[in-house]
């Protein structure tokens, strides 16, 4: 198989090691450079740098946007990792996946990703971090799995950085996705309520779940 890590926030490496040797990663791709999405990236680079069993001729490929040149340059570490740019106007092929991008609404430049497995046609869409955008209805159209930034409860619509539960559900319905998974969950409030609000907006035909540590979704 091909092991692609999407974002590398705090504690990512610790949890990853419970399932996969980080040396077996084939690539990393980043939606944006906020700390909660890249906090463990440097730790991962050190892991590759110092591990005695690593093939020194193999560099870890890390993909990111170039609109923050300082952070993009940090993706490359000599003899360890190589930073590769992606662009909204271009389709990117990484291993068995074809990836397209859409810029989101967020305080820093961030991109959503539509990832298609070439051999099966299965579609995974990750919003990155974003406020509500109608264009997600087309970007996520017919996705098998729609992973949506849902930090806010219903009643906080049109936020400048994150979806509400209602917005996530409405977009899932408009896009006709098969499964909606809520991520970037709030540290406050009743998460079952958040899920129920999203389910109500999505309708009965779409399965809605909460993301959780160690949870696996088969597409």
Regions found by a protein language model. Give the residues of each.
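Metallo-beta-lactamase
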Residues: 54-110, 118-119
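Metal-dependent catalytic neighborhoods of phosphoester/phosphodiester hydrolases
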Residues: 40-48, 73-74, 190-198
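Conserved beta-strand hairpin/beta-sheet module of binuclear metal-dependent hydrolase folds
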Residues: 1-20, 110-128, 145
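Active-site metal-binding motif and surrounding structural segment of the metallo-beta-lactamase
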Residues: 3, 10-59
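Short gly/ser/thr-rich secondary-structure transition/capping motifs
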Residues: 9-11, 80-86, 125-131, 162
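Cap/insert and terminal regions of metallo-dependent hydrolase folds
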Residues: 132-217
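Active-site neighborhood of phospho(di)ester-bond hydrolases with catalytic His/Asp-centered motifs
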Residues: 5-9, 26-32, 36, 65, ...
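Short, well-ordered beta-strand micro-motif
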Residues: 93, 114-116, 216-218
């Amino acid at each position: 198989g091909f092991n692609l890590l999407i974002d590398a926030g705090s504690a990512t490496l610790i949890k990853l090691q419970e399932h996969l040797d980080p040396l077996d990663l084939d690539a990393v791709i980043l939606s944006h450079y906020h700390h909660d999405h890249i906090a463990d990236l440097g730790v991962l680079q050190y892991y590759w740098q110092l591990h005695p069993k690593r093939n020194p001729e193999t560099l870890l490929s890390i993909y990111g946007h170039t609109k923050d040149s300082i952070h993009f340059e940090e993706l490359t570490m000599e003899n360890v990792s190589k930073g590769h740019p992606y662009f909204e106007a271009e389709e990117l092929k990484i291993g068995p996946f074809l990836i397209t991008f859409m810029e989101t609404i967020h305080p820093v430049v961030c991109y959503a990703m539509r990832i298609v497995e070439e051999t099966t046609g299965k579609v995974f869409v990750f919003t990155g971090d974003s406020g509500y955008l109608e264009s997600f209805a087309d970007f996520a159209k017919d996705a098998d799995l729609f992973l949506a930034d849902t930090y806010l409860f219903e009643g906080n619509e049109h936020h400048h950085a994150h979806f509400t539960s209602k917005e996530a559900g409405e977009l899932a319905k408009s896009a006709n996705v098969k499964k909606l998974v809520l991520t970037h969950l709030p540290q406050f409030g009743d998460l079952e309520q958040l899920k129920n609000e999203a389910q109500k907006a999505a309708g009965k035909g779409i399965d809605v779940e909460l993301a959780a540590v160690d949870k696996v979704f088969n597409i």
